[in-house]
């Protein structure tokens, strides 16, 4: 069942999808990270997911 409430969508986005993923080791990092917490690589990408409307 899809979530249609915009407040709940924002909560889901911040809790689940607003992260960065290391391309080298796959570790999840905070959205403000500049380097990986596990392997210290600077090769980070935003986590894939849906876009907020």
From Swiss-Prot:
Record flagged with keyword Oxidoreductase: no
Ranges in coiled-coil conformation: none
Keyword Ribosomal protein included in the entry's annotation: yes
GO molecular function, one term: structural constituent of ribosome
GO BP field: translation
Keywords associated with the record: Ribonucleoprotein, Ribosomal protein
Top-level taxonomic group: Archaea
Cellular component terms (Gene Ontology): ribonucleoprotein complex; ribosome
PANTHER family: 50S RIBOSOMAL PROTEIN L40E, LARGE RIBOSOMAL SUBUNIT PROTEIN EL40
Alphabetized NCBIfam families for the sequence: PRK04136.1
Family per record: Belongs to the eukaryotic ribosomal protein eL40 family.
Name of the protein this chain belongs to: Large ribosomal subunit protein eL40
Organism from which the protein derives: Staphylothermus marinus (strain ATCC 43588 / DSM 3639 / JCM 9404 / F1)
């Amino acid at each position: 069942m899809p979530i249609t409430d915009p407040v709940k969508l924002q909560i889901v986005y911040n809790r689940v999808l607003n992260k960065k993923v290391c391309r080298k080791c796959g570790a999840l990092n905070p959205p403000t990270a500049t380097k990986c917490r596990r392997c210290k690589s600077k090769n980070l990408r935003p986590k894939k997911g849906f876009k907020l409307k």
